[in-house]
Amino acid sequence: MESFAGKELQHSGAVHAYQLDGKGGITPIGEQDVVNSEKPCWLHLDSTVPASARWLNKTLVVPDSVRTALAGESVRPRVTRLGEGTLITLRSINLNANARPDQLVAVRVFITDKLIISTRRRKILAIDEILTDLKEGNGPTDSGNWLVSIAEALTDHTSEFIDDLHEKIIDLEDDLLEQKIPPRGELALIRKQLIVLRRYMTPQRDVFSRISGEKLPWMQDDDRRRMQEIADRLGRGLEDLDASVARTTVLSDEITALMTEAMNRRTYTMSLLAMVFLPTTFLTGLFGVNLGGIPGGDAPFGFFTFCLMLVILVGGVAWWLKRSKWL
C-alpha cells in the first residue's frame, strides 16, 4: 500500500482518529500528514453511525471486500490475509453498563504497516485502554505492536471473567457442602457463560496462534513471540473453562441429589404422620357414625375417656415406630 495523505482518513463520524508517533504516543491526523509505516494511522469507527457507514462505502484506502467485512454482522473470530493487509475479527468481554459479560462484543480490524482501521457496534473497553496508554505516551509504536496490545487487553479481560466464574463455582460448591441449594437459574447462567466463552475463545486462540506464525511484514519477531504467549495464556484459560464445565455438571448432579433427598425426607415424614394418625382416624370415624349402640354414648365421661384412649393409642404407635427405628 502506497503512502497517502491524512485528509483521506478524516471524517466526522470517527470515534477515534489518530496517527501513531512511533514513540508510544499519538497525534491528531492532519490533512497534509503523510501516512507511512513509521507513523501509521489508526481510525476507530462505530459501524452503526451513518457517517462512518458512508465513509466505509466510499473510501479508496481499503479494498472493496474489506468494506463489507468491517461493517458486517458479528461472526466468530477469524483472520484473513488480503494482499498487503490482514482482516481480523476478535471478540471482547462485554464490560458495558447493564450488559452481561457473556454477551460478547465484536471488534473488526483491517491492518497494514501504514493503516489500522477498527470497527465496533458496541463500546469496547480494551480499545479505550490502548487509547489511554497512547495518550500517556506508553502505547504501541507501530501496527504490529498495536495488534499485540489489543490482543493482550482482550485476553486480560477474558482471564478476569474466567476467574470470576471460577470463584462463583467455588461459592456454589461451598453452599452445597452446607446443604444450601443455590437460587433457581444461577447454575444454568454460569454454565451458559462458560459454553459461550468456550465457543468463541477457542477460535480466537487459534487466530492469535496463526498471527504469531505468519510472516506478516509489519510484525517484528518480538511481537510474534508476545502474540504466541498470549495464545498460550488464552489456551490455559480454555483448559480452565473445560474443567469448570465439568464441575458444573457435578454441581448439577449434587443439587438434584440434594433436592431429591429433601423431597424424600418430606415424603417420609408425611408417611409417618399418616401411620401415627391412621388408627385414631379409624376410631373417630367408627364412633362418629349416627347409629345406636355406640359404647359409652350415654356415659358422662365417655368423650373424655375416648380422647384419653386416642392419646394412649398415638403414644403407643409412636413408641412402636421408635422401637422399629422408623423415627
From Swiss-Prot:
Q: Which residues cross the membrane?
A: 272-292, 301-321
> Where found, per UniProt?
Cell inner membrane
The catalytic activity, as recorded, is: Zn(2+)(out) + H(+)(out) = Zn(2+)(in) + H(+)(in)
Membrane topology per the record?
A: Multi-pass membrane protein
Which residues lie toward the Periplasmic compartment? 293-300
GO cellular-component term (any) = plasma membrane
Extract the InterPro entries matched here: CorA_cytoplasmic_dom (IPR045861), CorA_TM1_TM2 (IPR045863), MgTranspt_CorA/ZnTranspt_ZntB (IPR002523), Zn_transp_ZntB (IPR023714)
Give the Cytoplasmic membrane side ranges: 1-271, 322-327
MF term (GO), any: cobalt ion transmembrane transporter activity
* Biological function: Zinc transporter. Acts as a Zn(2+):proton symporter, which likely mediates zinc ion uptake.
Which protein family is it in? Belongs to the CorA metal ion transporter (MIT) (TC 1.A.35) family.
Q: Under what name is this protein listed?
A: Zinc transport protein ZntB
Q: Which organism is it from?
A: Pectobacterium atrosepticum (strain SCRI 1043 / ATCC BAA-672)
Primary gene name: zntB
